[in-house]
């Protein structure tokens, strides 16, 4: 499995943000759902080595997040909800900067591939600050996949996009999920139903359910994902 998590825990003072969760993930798109404050973003930050865990273990592509953080980062692409970008940079300039960080062998070739893959061609010569939110999200995603990682962690990648932009980003995520392991955090149930192969619902720092969408519906009298989510988290 590309991701393996065992009893992962994060404690802030007296508050347990993530409480001993365990799961595995392989190629495909894993929907990571939960209400605000459930521990989703904290889990993602631990998996991407932005913050250390308090207890438990996790590995990405066989590398432990505690003992081999640089190897984890080489094998993972992360698009945080805030999508930090250098708005004074041109699109190609920003991608070139990221390519330099990753020391890519043929940066120009890879940048061209990613620009085409993410649909940034028409905007590649603009400054990032001139782009719409949809294209900024594409730049963030392009940066995340530039070094061709096996694992992608995407935190609310379609937040604030219009319907046309949503379709484009969802299709891109779906295409990437054919060969990569993607952890997708979102509050949009239709998005999960459109692109995810499996769903984890986390509530109060614990995993409430971990299953495929068909199995989840079958076990809940074919209720909608939204109805299932409300039942599991409204307590």
Language-model features, listed with the residues they occupy:
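Conserved ABC ATPase "signature" region
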Residues: 96, 100-123
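Catalytic Walker B motif of ABC-type/P-loop ATPase nucleotide-binding domains
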Residues: 152-156
